[in-house]
Amino acid sequence: MLLAGSIFVLTLILAIWQPRGLSIGWSASICAALALVSGVIHVGDIPVVWNIVWNATATFIAVIIISLLLDESGFFEWAALHVSRWGNGRGRLLFTWIVLLGAAVAALFANDGAALILTPIVIAMLLALGFSKRTTLAFVMAAGFIADTASLPLIVSNLVNIVSADFFRLGFTEYASVMLPVDIAAIAATLGMLHLFFRRDIPATYDVSLLKMPASAIKDPATFRAGWIVLVLLLVGFFVLEPLGIPVSAIAAVGTVVLFAVAKKGHAINTGKVLRGAPWQIVVFSLGMYLVVYGLRNAGLTEYLSGVLNMLADKGLLAATFGTGFLTAFLSSVMNNMPTVLVGALSIDGSTASGVIKEAMIYANVIGCDLGPKITPIGSLATLLWLHVLSQKNMTISWGYYFRTGIIMTLPVLFVTLAALALRLSVTL
């Protein structure tokens, strides 16, 4: 256990701090090779882990490429300018609409896309409105927070969701039927906490006339229009074709190819830049990191956690839901959500839980791994990248401020979300 744990910690350190520019793919690969050479994992574990990650990472990359193409076309800026006008000059209403826009983008384009794409747009828009740095920080923190807390409803809304759904063979419709109502509760709780926490930083009014016209944001009309069609067809495809056995990644890939072809033909978007900006490293990172995590499983960590989950399962639905959710949220905050979701899945699979109790644990693991990363900056790689993007915009957020905000905001939202899950599953008892 000590050797497997040491290799895992080394993987996290290299991935988070990236010494001398070492990419996350290389760091995970080096540590996976170390785990293999040291006997922590075996050659036979490689195809097992690949079977866990291939569909998830392929889907994630396809969704991110679609979001990057739409961003280049002006899609998200157009949407942000529209919702800003819906605020009608009232600061609190503007804050609400920005948060709801973030929730919608997170649901359709994954949490990473929501945080990284919306943040620069929101900053530019708030600067145009003449908002103070403190007010801008409130809006930016809100956009970053909702990106994760609202990434529950669909399998494609978060890489964590895809990994878990693949592991337990959850269908797209089956997953959405449980998590859509849970996500609504999460959004409502998040919106309430954000308004409460930042109540002194939200201006009473703003001048709508300072905003650009939404139409002026559209840089590639053809890709912009095609984007709407692709999004509708993707959602239909996910719900209709996935139950027929077609992988979510294949459906997403078709949508990506269609939108990419439209953008390529129009010449207004630098499609080469978009491809270079796609997170290709996540494929290598996921395989390498999960091989290292599999080493923890081989060393007995998941067996120990399975015992903890068995105790929770014996106490009923509420204990299983809240216990699993808070446990994986804590683990995500200290050891990153990507490895935690697999550790959680392996532990649940190894437990004696069954029926609705096991179902509650599966979804609570997803909730914990989606929301838990908001407690600390190291909870997800996307958060670290988001903080880096902010620093480039002269908005430095200290780890202390992030942790203080994160723990105050996350725990109540996590509680409400897990309660909503328990209520949703109790309906099917």
Curated annotation (Swiss-Prot):
The chain crosses the membrane at residues 21-41, 46-66, 98-118, 136-156, 178-198, 228-248, 249-269, 274-294, 316-336, 337-357, 371-391, 407-427. InterPro entries: Arsenical_pump_ArsB. Keywords: Arsenical resistance, Cell inner membrane, Cell membrane, Membrane, Plasmid, Transmembrane, Transmembrane helix, Transport, Transposable element. GO terms for biological process: response to arsenic-containing substance. One of its GO terms (molecular function) is antimonite secondary active transmembrane transporter activity. The keyword Metal-binding does not apply. It is found in: Cell inner membrane. Its main location: membrane. One of its GO terms (cellular component) is plasma membrane. It is a multi-pass membrane protein. Belongs to the ArsB family. Involved in arsenical resistance. Thought to form the channel of an arsenite pump. NCBIfam families: 2a45, PRK15445.1. This is Arsenical pump membrane protein. It comes from Yersinia enterocolitica.
